[in-house]
């Protein structure tokens, strides 16, 4: 069986490294992007099964990345989980309006994140 592919988008290299390490332990293939522009390119070129997306990104923010992908017929099927320190109700509402499937605030428990990923990608 092919590994499920997860695109990790965050401008903090330590967060990307930690997520990648944990996801690879669970047998996921990981793709990395460090800004919104790179995220869009990799989403379109790599065809990930799921995207972990920070909001506060250089070049194009996570809200816009989510909106651009979710309102494009070719990519709207890809689940997007927003991972962000922005925990106010208005931020969550904007995340939902952009089409994000889940909104998880930092800091988060890896077990919780893995259960959400499994919800979308199966075991």
Tell where the protein language model's regions lie, with residue ranges.
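Active-site beta3 strand of CheY-like receiver
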Residues: 46-52, 57
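The feature encodes the CheY-like receiver
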Residues: 16, 58, 76, 88
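Charged docking surfaces used in two-component/phosphorelay signaling
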Residues: 17-25
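Short hydrophobic/Thr-rich beta-strand motif most characteristic of the beta2 strand and flanking loop
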Residues: 27-34, 42
């Amino acid at each position: 069986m092919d590994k499920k592919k997860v695109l990790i988008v965050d401008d903090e290299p330590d967060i990307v490294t930690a997520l990648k390490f944990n996801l690879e332990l669970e047998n996921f293939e990981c793709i990395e992007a460090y800004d919104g522009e790179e995220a869009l390119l990799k989403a379109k070129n790599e065809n990930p099964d799921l995207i972990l997306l920070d909001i506060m990104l250089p070049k194009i923010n996570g809200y816009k990345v989510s909106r651009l992908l979710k309102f494009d017929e070719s990519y709207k099927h890809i689940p997007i989980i927003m991972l962000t320190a922005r925990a106010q109700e208005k931020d969550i509402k904007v995340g939902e309006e952009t089409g994000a499937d889940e909104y998880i605030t930092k800091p988060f428990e890896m077990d919780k994140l893995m259960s959400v990923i499994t919800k979308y990608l199966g075991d």
